[in-house]
């Protein structure tokens, strides 16, 4: 005879699949970041950037500081970020930005264009770059 008080098996499976899915996403980020780190150009401090990205992902942090690392490119960024500081690097372009991003500091780089900016963006600092114009930014309240 089967016990009556057993919880349904699907409850545990949903949690297992959710955890597995999160682990897969984390592993995808990590493998991309390892490859990006291996392709470092002289003068870049990608090892420090990798460590900061990894800690941000593991701790589900919403703020990421990759400033002053001599970076010429960025890897794909975690989706949960709402604040990014990539100032004082040598970036000529930015990757696709997280949809929930509220603050972006990309000042003192070599940007000549910006990717599509998230509608959630409230603050942007792109001073000291090679930008001639900014796209329309309806939700931004502070521009530098």
Give residue ranges: language-model regions:
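N-terminal capping/linker segments that flank leucine-rich repeat
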Residues: 1-74, 79-81
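Conserved hydrophobic beta-strand positions in leucine-rich repeat
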Residues: 64-66, 84-86, 104-106, 124-126, ...
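Canonical leucine-rich repeat
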Residues: 74-77, 94-97, 114-117, 134-137
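Thr-biased low-complexity repeat/linker tracts and other Thr-enriched repetitive architectures
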Residues: 88-92, 112-113
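Ankyrin-repeat and related helical/solenoid repeat scaffolds used for protein-protein interactions
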Residues: 117-144
């Amino acid at each position: 005879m089967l016990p009556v008080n057993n919880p349904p098996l699907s409850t545990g499976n949903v949690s297992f699949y959710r955890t597995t899915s999160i682990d897969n996403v984390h592993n995808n980020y990590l493998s991309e970041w390892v490859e990006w780190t291996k392709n470092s150009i002289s003068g870049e401090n990608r090892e420090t950037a990798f460590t900061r990205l990894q800690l941000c992902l593991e701790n589900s942090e919403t703020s990421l500081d990759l400033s002053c690392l001599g970076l010429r490119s960025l890897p794909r960024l975690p989706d949960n970020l709402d604040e990014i500081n990539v100032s004082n690097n040598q970036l000529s372009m930015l990757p696709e930005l997280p949809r929930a991003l509220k603050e972006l500091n990309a000042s003192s780089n070599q940007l000549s264009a910006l990717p599509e900016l998230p509608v959630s963006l409230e603050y942007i600092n792109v001073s000291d770059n090679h930008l001639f114009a900014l796209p329309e930014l309806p939700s931004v309240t502070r521009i530098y």
